A protein has these predicted regions:
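A short, hydrophobic beta-strand element within the central beta-sheet of small alpha/beta folds
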Residues: 68-94
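Conserved phosphotransfer cores of two-component systems
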Residues: 37-41, 71-78, 100
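Two-component/phosphorelay signaling modules centered on CheY-like receiver
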Residues: 1-23
Length: 187
């Protein structure tokens, strides 16, 4: 669904008040700048619906929606945050939940118009929301203790991006032997 689709669903519902002001961003850089602008002009951001996969903002090291969410919460601590993602990898979902702790998270395949409104209602009521798929993936991670370790998840992420073991060792400041042992445990 697109931003316009989400806005249309909200306009036909009574979940939010009629006088909604939307701030849209299509990249991490645009989100960063709009968050800063809102802070400068003392505009509060009450709810943010963030796509995990947005073009990066290298200059500020904002690489995805998780980083946008962290930056937003740093500047607007009372803002309710929802991350929507097309990422289905369980360790990425685990990292989002553990390290970002959004108020709501769902995969895009889980989100219909009704579910979208349910997410917003839950989050605005002070509850956490996790879609069925996200919950299943988190349970799978907890069943396999090897994935709970952050270094192991980082190793898997680097491997999936094509990094060599020597490059991963440099990135994580651990020995190649340690990485090889961790990979063996993961298998």
């Amino acid at each position: 669904m697109t931003i316009e689709g989400y806005k249309m669903i909200l306009s036909f519902s009574n979940v939010l008040s009629d006088n909604i002001n939307y701030i849209e961003a299509n990249s991490c850089e645009e989100a960063y700048l709009k968050i800063n602008r809102a802070k400068e002009i003392n505009t509060n951001i009450d709810l943010a619906i963030i796509d995990y996969s947005m073009p990066i903002y290298k200059q500020e090291n904002i690489l995805n929606g998780s980083d946008v969410c962290k930056y937003l919460k740093k500047n607007f601590p009372n803002c309710k945050t929802i991350i929507l993602t097309s990422i289905l990898e369980n360790f990425t979902l685990f990292d989002i939940v553990q390290n970002v702790s959004p108020d709501g998270i769902a995969t895009k395949m889980d989100v219909s118009g009704d579910v979208f409104l349910k997410i917003i209602e839950n989050v605005l009521s002070g509850n956490k929301f996790r879609s069925v798929f996200v919950v299943e993936q988190l349970e799978e991670i907890w069943e396999n203790e090897v994935f709970i370790n952050e270094k192991n998840r980082l190793i898997l992420q680097y491997l999936s991006k094509g990094f060599k073991i020597s490059e991963i060792a440099n990135e994580l400041s651990i020995s190649e032997i340690t990485i090889k042992k961790r990979i063996t445990k993961i298998r």
